[in-house]
């Protein structure tokens, strides 16, 4: 089942909706014919469908934002054989389609141009990885708090951070800024980038210097369910004087997140 109700891009930029991501690329890659189907089942498929719920939509423009341009990717799923799909070619047509939507006054999402970040502690430093689902854009970033431009650092690999740092980045195409500015405020303290031992893979988020947003599926929250055992150890790698200890959390009716 395909839903257009989930976040269609990096969640830091998106209006609140249902948890989880379903980007333009995810919809493009969707295949309604399942691998475990018998061969004769494919001929019985009458078409494709995407579901749209409106609990988080307050006006028609909110619906347009969630539907377009992902509806174009769904159409590509419907009329193109899997082996004939070409993401790069689709994106070229997408630019013209977006111009058409703008001319019609349709409030379409530009999420395809926004940056998804990953901040991972490694060897006493933070490695900041920046990605965009569009391979035809360039990413430029700054470390001095100014907004990025074509004259800024061009991103060509993980950025190594070893102190409190503000990283700003955006995508560019043909000399024009395409996506929103990503603003990462990395805070360094005694625990930042230190080795952490625990029982969940994403517990490293506790020492990556970055606070989560209000959207708990933004890939910056470490979550435990009600009956989970919580145990982790941060190795400060030496004797330290601690004057203050703090931890942030949010409570969800179904999950407790720290």
Segment roles from a protein language model:
Residues 1-139, 189-203:
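Substrate-binding groove of N-acetylhexosamine-processing glycoside hydrolases
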Residues 257-258:
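Surface-exposed turn/loop modules enriched in turn-prone residues
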Residues 231-242:
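Extracellular and analogous surface-interaction loops
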Residues 85, 91-233, 250-253:
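Short, compositionally stereotyped local motifs that mark structural "simplifiers"
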């Amino acid at each position: 089942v395909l839903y257009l109700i989930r976040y269609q891009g990096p969640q830091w930029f998106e209006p609140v909706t249902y948890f989880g991501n379903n980007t333009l690329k995810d919809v493009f890659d969707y295949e309604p014919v399942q691998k475990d189907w018998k061969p004769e089942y494919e001929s019985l498929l009458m078409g494709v469908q995407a579901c749209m719920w409106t609990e988080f939509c307050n006006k028609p423009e909110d619906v347009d934002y969630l539907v377009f341009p992902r509806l174009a990717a769904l159409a590509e799923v419907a009329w193109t054989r899997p082996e004939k799909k070409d993401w790069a070619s689709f994106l070229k047509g997408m630019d013209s389609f977006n111009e058409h939507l703008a001319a019609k006054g349709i409030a379409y999402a530009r999420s395809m141009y926004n940056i998804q970040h990953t901040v991972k502690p490694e060897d006493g430093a933070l490695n900041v990885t920046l990605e965009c689902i569009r391979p035809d854009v360039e990413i430029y970033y700054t470390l001095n708090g100014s907004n990025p431009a074509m004259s800024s650092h061009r991103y060509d690999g993980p950025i190594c951070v070893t102190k409190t740092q503000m990283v700003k980045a955006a995508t560019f195409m043909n000399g024009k800024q395409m996506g929103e500015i990503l603003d990462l405020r990395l805070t360094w303290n005694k625990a930042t980038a230190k080795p952490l031992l625990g029982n969940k893979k994403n517990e490293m988020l506790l020492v990556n210097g970055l606070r989560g947003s209000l959207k708990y599926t933004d890939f910056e929250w470490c979550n435990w369910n009600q009956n989970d055992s919580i145990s982790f150890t941060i190795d400060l790698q030496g004797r330290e004087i601690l004057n203050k200890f703090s931890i942030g959390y949010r409570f969800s009716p179904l999950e407790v997140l720290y």
